């Protein structure tokens, strides 16, 4: 526990941190990578280049300083980060490195005096212990469960299938022929990629897209125009190739009782965690109403359309509505899609007709912000709204 003086000193630095902004974490990462370039094998350098990771870390530091007297308020954030850390194989020995360069950054940017540096060192130590303990639990759980493993395991690509012009799916089976760890629908896999074209090892997280089956995993990857790893996966990796995988992780997953109505809302590749949820609801013969709402540019980039249609034909409690922003001439209204333009939920009165309904959504950030506002405007309780950000987390 932190003493009152330490807490007071840390809280007194909040205005300084806020005024500095992500410049703080930019300096931190530059310093840490200079002294420990091997950590570039862990961190997503694309997120470093875009500034997303710097912003996410800055927000986390400010949230910790603000809630330092009430760490319980940070537990959801701790869980989300711990899940990601274990997908990246973060170990206890990494925390002193981060702490050293965080304190050095504060000193170099602000020269706040030894009392402030000591207070932040204590505060960081407490937070590091929280993460180390939780991550140890996650590692141990995934190692001891049926089909589980602790860090990395070799998987063979047994099926590669083009699902749209930009999305490709990969079915993965353990090279050792054993079972695979159960996962919660909505969680992701960490994929470790080493290739002659890459300067460093790259790690990416991709959502699982089927119901758990104990034998294989399926992920789907969107080919981004400037995406180093996504283009490599699409163009270079083929059936028979081996990839190393961390166990399923993630704090975004389907968690409802059999009588709970569910709305699954997505845009683009954001449908991938929803697809796992839909397949699971179907396999479990979920009795309550399920709504599938999806937005895509057009049929050329609408992945898994046939799979969802096949489920809808066998699942009478599933309602499906698809929006195409700019349909092609070959896209059939009423068959391939139901509405043209952007997804608009304002006229869907059923959204709020059942106080038990839970809402899960994923997609590009502007889409999620728009959907979040629409749900809240219809009086949906925030605790029944669940969302996933691909990449560093953002509050919508």
Curated annotation (Swiss-Prot):
It holds the Pfam family Globin. Its cofactor is heme b; FAD. Consists of two distinct domains; an N-terminal heme-containing oxygen-binding domain and a C-terminal reductase domain with binding sites for FAD and NAD(P)H. This is Flavohemoprotein. The keyword Membrane does not apply. The keyword Mitochondrion does not apply. Residues 150-255 form the FAD-binding FR-type domain. Its EC number is 1.14.12.17. It comes from Yersinia pestis. Heme b binds at residue 85.
